Design a protein with these regions (language model features):
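Conserved alpha/beta cores of soluble small-molecule-handling proteins
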Residues: 1-127, 143, 149-203
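Short beta-strand/strand-turn micro-motif
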Residues: 129-135
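Short beta-strand-to-turn element immediately C-terminal to the catalytic PLP-Schiff-base lysine
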Residues: 138-139
Length: 203
């Protein structure tokens, strides 16, 4: 069975970026199952439902698993950012994560090759894309640029582009010396919450 996921940040009871998560869920279902009925995540998510003793955690991760029949599973857990201090460049031209599949085996296999680094930065067809868990942006000291062709067009990325905080750009590994800082972000990692110097990206 083909399953997909949405990972949604709940910040002290506030569901973040819900409209974009909802749009991606329904776009995915329409692509794979054109006859599917649109769903409203708000019908399934509720901040009281995040309870069972974890609402006091502050930041909660809601993990929604869905497929052809609709929502298959919904779980909540306290969330803490996993710190990343180094990235290993990893080349692959075959990986495809256009849709947020519950099956992450290709990403997990690449992640296992990271060596002493904390995470990987995937290079596809000569261009930087994403880490194993996040979109990225690079700063030249004036502007923030995000790869124009990420593996997954994340909901946080879409919001930052719309707000004018990010600009899309084709970025190659050989362009890295032009930048000073790399930021990682996704639905759970806020903008500016996780960054490291570009010199900590290793071939």
């Amino acid at each position: 069975m083909c399953l997909f996921i949405e990972t949604i940040r709940i910040d002290h009871g506030r569901v973040c970026n819900l409209s974009r998560h909802n749009r991606r869920l329904n776009d995915t279902r329409a692509h794979f199952w054109p006859e599917s009925t649109p769903l409203q995540l708000s019908d399934y998510l509720s901040s009281p439902g995040c309870g069972a003793g974890i609402t006091g955690a502050g930041i909660v991760k809601a993990r929604v698993v869905y497929g052809e029949k609709g929502i298959e599973d919904l779980s909540y857990s306290p969330y803490a950012v996993r710190h990343v201090h180094s990235l290993a460049l990893m080349q692959t031209d075959t990986i495809d994560y256009t849709y947020k599949s519950a099956g992450r085996e290709p990403l997990n296999c690449l992640f296992a090759l990271r060596g002493a680094c904390d995470d990987i930065l995937i290079v596809k067809q000569g261009l930087l894309t994403d880490t194993s868990i996040a979109n990225i942006a690079l700063s030249d000291g004036t502007h923030w640029y995000t790869p124009a062709h990420p593996l997954l067009k994340g909901t946080k990325r879409a919001a930052l582009l719309e707000e004018g905080i990010l600009q899309e750009k084709d970025i190659r590994p050989e362009d890295l010396p032009s930048f000073s800082t790399v930021r990682l972000f996704n639905a759970m990692i806020d903008w500016g919450e996780l960054e490291l110097p570009v010199r900590n990206i290793t071939p």
